[in-house]
C-alpha cells in the first residue's frame, strides 16, 4: 500500500515535468545519431557557459579533479553534473526490486509513472544541490550577493539540470539509442580526456613565464623536438602533477586495453532446447557481468557527499561534526588551485589520486580500497536483481524459451544459477573496483575516467551496431 501511495503521490507532481513524446514516424539510424549528437552538443554548451552574476571570489573548487567522473563543470552551468540522474535511477530501481514501492512494469501506466518518479526525484536532487552550492558561498557570500542574485544563481544551476533530464528522455524515448545518462557521461569523460591529450592550449607553470601545453601528447612532442636539454624538458611533461602527464597518458592506454580485453572473458554455460532434441548452444556469462554500473552509482553518491561536505565545511568550519566528517587543505600554487581532502570520514570514501598520495597515506589507500570493493559488490548484487539479471530472472528466461542447462533437470537449475550468477556479479564488481583503484593511483581521475568511458562508449557502440543490424535485416 505504501508503494501504491508513493506512485499516486508522484502523479500530480509529474505534471510539473511534461513527458517527451516519442517519434511519430520511424526514424532511420542516421536521424537517431543526429538526435544523439545534438543532445551531446547541448550538454557540452551548458558545461562551458559561465554562471552569470557570481561574485569573483578566491573560493577553491572542493571537487576539482573528480568532476571528470560525475559529468560536472567547475565554472559552467552544469556544475551539478549527472550525479542526480544516476542516483535517482539507482534508488528507485532498487526500491522497486525490493517491493518497497509498488510498480507493475507490465502496465503502461505504471511504467510511465515510474519514469516520471525518476524525473521528479532527479529534479529534487538538482534543486538541493543548487541550493547547497549557492548557500555554501561558492559564488560569494549571501551578504555580497543579495536575495535577488542568490535566487538567480540557484535558478541558473537548477534549470540546466532540468534540461539535462529532458536530454536523457529525448534519447530514451526513441529519438536516440540506448541510455541518455550513459551517452552524456561518456561524451563528457571522453571530451575531457581528449582535451587533456590533444589540446594546444598553453598555461603558465611558474612566475618566470614558462608554460606548457595542456595536451600531454602535444606537449611531449613539442618538448622532444624543441629543446636541447631533452632530459629536463621531457621530465616536466612526463611527470607533471598539474595536468595529465605523458606517463599517465600511457597508463590510460593500458587501462583501456585491459578493460577491452576483459570484456571478452566469459564462461559459456551449455544449454539445450527442452523441446527439440540435439539443439545445443551456450549462454555466455561475462566476467564483467554488471560492468562499471556499481562504480558509477558509488561515484554519484560520493559526488553528492562532497558537495554537502563542502557546504558544511564552509558554513561551520570549526564544529566538531565538520571535523569528524571532512577536513580540507588548500592547494593554491601558481599552477594548481584546489581544496584537497585530508581527513574526516568522507576522506576515506575519496580515491587516492596519484602514486605519492597512495604511498604517503597507506591507511587511506587500504581503507578506501576495502570500502569500495564492499560497496560495489553490494551494489552489483542489488543491480543484478533490479534489472532482471538475477538467477530467478534468468531461469524465467530459460523457461519462456524452453531451454534447460545441459546435465541439469529443470527442478535443479535454479540452485545452479544461484551459484554462478551472484559469483559473476561479485567478480565483476571486484575486478572493476581493483582496476579503478590502480588507474586512480597511476593516472589520477584520468585513468578512472578512461575505465568508465570505455564501458559507456562500448555500450553505446553495441546499441548502434545492433540497430544497424536490425535495419539491415529489415526489422
Swiss-Prot record:
Q: What is this protein called?
A: Uncharacterized protein C19G7.17
**Superkingdom, natural source:** Eukaryota
**Any one GO molecular function term:** signal sequence binding
* Pfam families xref list: Plug_translocon, SecY
Looking at the UniProt record for this protein, which Gene Ontology cellular component terms does it annotate, in alphabetical order? Answer: Sec61 translocon complex
- Kindly list the biological process annotations in GO that this record carries: post-translational protein targeting to membrane, translocation; protein insertion into ER membrane; SRP-dependent cotranslational protein targeting to membrane, translocation
Amino acid at each position: 500500500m505504501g508503494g501504491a501511495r508513493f506512485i499516486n503521490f508522484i502523479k500530480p507532481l509529474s505534471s510539473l515535468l511534461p513527458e517527451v513524446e516519442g517519434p511519430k514516424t520511424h526514424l532511420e539510424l542516421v536521424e537517431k545519431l543526429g538526435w544523439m549528437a545534438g543532445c551531446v552538443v547541448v550538454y557540452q554548451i551548458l558545461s562551458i557557459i559561465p554562471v552569470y552574476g557570481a561574485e569573483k571570489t578566491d573560493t577553491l573548487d572542493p571537487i576539482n579533479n573528480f568532476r571528470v567522473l560525475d559529468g560536472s563543470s567547475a565554472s559552467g552551468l552544469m556544475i551539478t553534473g549527472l550525479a542526480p540522474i544516476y542516483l535517482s535511477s539507482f534508488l528507485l530501481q532498487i526500491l522497486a526490486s525490493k517491493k518497497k514501492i509498488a510498480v507493475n512494469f507490465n502496465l503502461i501506466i505504471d511504467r510511465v509513472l515510474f519514469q516520471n518518479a525518476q524525473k521528479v526525484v532527479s529534479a529534487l536532487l538538482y534543486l538541493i544541490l543548487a541550493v547547497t552550492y549557492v548557500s555554501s558561498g561558492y559564488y560569494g557570500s549571501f551578504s555580497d550577493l543579495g536575495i535577488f542574485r542568490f535566487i538567480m544563481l540557484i535558478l541558473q544551476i537548477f534549470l540546466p539540470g532540468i534540461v539535462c533530464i529532458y536530454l536523457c528522455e529525448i534519447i530514451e524515448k526513441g529519438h536516440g539509442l540506448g541510455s541518455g545518462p550513459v551517452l552524456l557521461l561518456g561524451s563528457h569523460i571522453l571530451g575531457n580526456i581528449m582535451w587533456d591529450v590533444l589540446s594546444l592550449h598553453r598555461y603558465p607553470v611558474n612566475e618566470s613565464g614558462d608554460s606548457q601545453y595542456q595536451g600531454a601528447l602535444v606537449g611531449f612532442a613539442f618538448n622532444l623536438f624543441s629543446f636541447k636539454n631533452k632530459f629536463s624538458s621531457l621530465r616536466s611533461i612526463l611527470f607533471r602533477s598539474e595536468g595529465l602527464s605523458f606517463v599517465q597518458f600511457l597508463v590510460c592506454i593500458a587501462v583501456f586495453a585491459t578493460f577491452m580485453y576483459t570484456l571478452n572473458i566469459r564462461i559459456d554455460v551449455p544449454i539445450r532446447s527442452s523441446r527439440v532434441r540435439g539443439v545445443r548452444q551456450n549462454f555466455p556469462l561475462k566476467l564483467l557481468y554488471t560492468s562499471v554500473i556499481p562504480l558509477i552509482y558509488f561515484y554519484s553518491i560520493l559526488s553528492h557527499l562532497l558537495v554537502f561536505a563542502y557546504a558544511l565545511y564552509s558554513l561551520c568550519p570549526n564544529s566538531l561534526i565538520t571535523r569528524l566528517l571532512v577536513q580540507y587543505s588548500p592547494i593554491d600554487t601558481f599552477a594548481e588551485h584546489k581544496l584537497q581532502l585530508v581527513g574526516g570520514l568522507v576522506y576515506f570514501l575519496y580515491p587516492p589520486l596519484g602514486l605519492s598520495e597512495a604511498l604517503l597515506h597507506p591507511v587511506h589507500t587500504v581503507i578506501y580500497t576495502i570500502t569500495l570493493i564492499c560497496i560495489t559488490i553490494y551494489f552489483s548484487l542489488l543491480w543484478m536483481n533490479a534489472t532482471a539479471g538475477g538467477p530467478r530472472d534468468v531461469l524465467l528466461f530459460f523457461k519462456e524459451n524452453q531451454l534447460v542447462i545441459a546435465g541439469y533437470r529443470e527442478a535443479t537449475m535454479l540452485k545452479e544459477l544461484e551459484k554462478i550468477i551472484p559469483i559473476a556479479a561479485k567478480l565483476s564488481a571486484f575486478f572493476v573496483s581493483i582496476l579503478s583503484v590502480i588507474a586512480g593511483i597511476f593516472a589520477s581521475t584520468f585513468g578512472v575516467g578512461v575505465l568508465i568511458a570505455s564501458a559507456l562508449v562500448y555500450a553505446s557502440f553495441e546499441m548502434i551496431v545492433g540497430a544497424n543490424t536490425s535495419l539491415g535485416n529489415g526489422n
